[in-house]
């Protein structure tokens, strides 16, 4: 049985729940850790919608919630949260929780092809019913596109070198496995000073491309804001700077009253403030949490409340 330890569990759920009788969304169900805690905190009148695009995670995680009747688990991407809520006849919610990134199930299960340490087919799909795989990205994307993805999504300064080497290698034989790709990158890139694996940034970049992760986040944040009732909250846990930047900028933009240029004396944009930022600085894991769950070390929780 795979176990995914929920990150910032108490902090995120305590910020999320403002009304025990309210309607909440766990947009990243995973193995159900956050959902279970939410259900423990809300009343029998409260209701939880849990979403995940990983069918395997849902099958494993739903066992934790068998005792609860006030929950609906849905296989979908969180960017479709508006459609899901409309189908359920829900007009407003009291809060939504996002826990971005890859789960321990996806990382630890060898055949899912997420890990640079375990040999598997280059897959990396969070939703195994989707078509695009890491194999497709690595073997069919142009050198220019590969370089752009690795630089932008992986923040990898050796992106050009890596992209060129991938194209050269695949011209002789397709790159089929995680360890093939990982070994190739390791032969090109010095080990980072922070001790992380040389292939970590490139694998992150390819995973983000395969799953459209950053676009999903942007779409889901916008849609969820429309469904939040006044006083409802968005809680977002990110694990790298790209995710965190999207959340931070989204909260900032929607907390502003006017976005007209400063040289315009009278507001013409008509923009209204929609959010109050609750966490002026992101909440990070305690030393104790990091020691017990090393994967939590980069987590950041940001919270905003609907005006």
UniProtKB/Swiss-Prot annotation:
Gene Ontology cellular component list: cytoplasm
Region span, Disordered: 287-307
Annotated InterPro entries: RsmH (IPR002903), SAM-dep_MeTrfase_MraW_recog (IPR023397), SAM-dependent_MTases_sf (IPR029063)
GO molecular function, one term: rRNA (cytosine-N4-)-methyltransferase activity
Localization in the cell: Cytoplasm
EC category name: transferase
Name of this protein: Ribosomal RNA small subunit methyltransferase H
Species per Swiss-Prot/TrEMBL record: Caldicellulosiruptor bescii (strain ATCC BAA-1888 / DSM 6725 / KCTC 15123 / Z-1320) (Anaerocellum thermophilum)
């Amino acid at each position: 049985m795979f176990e995914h330890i929920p990150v910032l569990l108490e902090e995120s759920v305590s910020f999320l729940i403002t009304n025990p009788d309210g309607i909440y969304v766990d947009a990243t169900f995973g193995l159900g850790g956050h959902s279970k805690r939410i259900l423990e905190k809300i009343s029998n009148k409260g209701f939880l919608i849990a979403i995940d695009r990983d069918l395997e995670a849902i099958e494993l995680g739903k066992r934790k919630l068998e005792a609860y009747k006030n929950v609906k688990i849905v296989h979908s991407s969180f960017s479709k949260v508006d459609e899901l809520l409309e189908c359920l006849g829900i007009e407003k919610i009291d809060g939504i929780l996002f826990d971005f990134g890859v789960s321990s199930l996806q990382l630890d299960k060898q055949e899912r092809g997420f890990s640079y340490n375990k040999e598997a087919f280059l897959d990396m799909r969070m939703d195994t019913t989707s078509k695009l795989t890491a194999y497709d990205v690595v073997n069919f994307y142009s050198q220019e596109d590969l370089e752009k993805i690795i630089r932008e999504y992986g923040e990898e300064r050796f992106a050009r070198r890596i992209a060129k080497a991938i194209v050269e290698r695949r011209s002789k034989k397709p790159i089929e496995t995680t360890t093939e790709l990982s070994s190739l990158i390791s032969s090109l890139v010095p080990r980072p000073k922070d001790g992380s694996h040389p292939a970590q940034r490139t694998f992150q970049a390819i995973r983000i491309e395969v799953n459209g992760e950053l676009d999903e986040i942007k779409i889901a944040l916008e849609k969820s804001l429309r469904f939040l009732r006044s006083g409802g909250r968005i809680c977002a846990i990110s694990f790298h700077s790209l995710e965190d930047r999207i959340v931070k900028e989204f909260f900032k933009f929607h907390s502003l009253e006017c976005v007209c240029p400063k040289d315009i004396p009278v507001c013409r944009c008509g923009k209204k403030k929609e959010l109050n930022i609750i966490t002026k600085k992101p909440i990070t894991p305690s030393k104790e949490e990091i020691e017990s769950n090393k994967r939590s070390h980069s987590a950041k929780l940001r919270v905003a409340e609907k005006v």
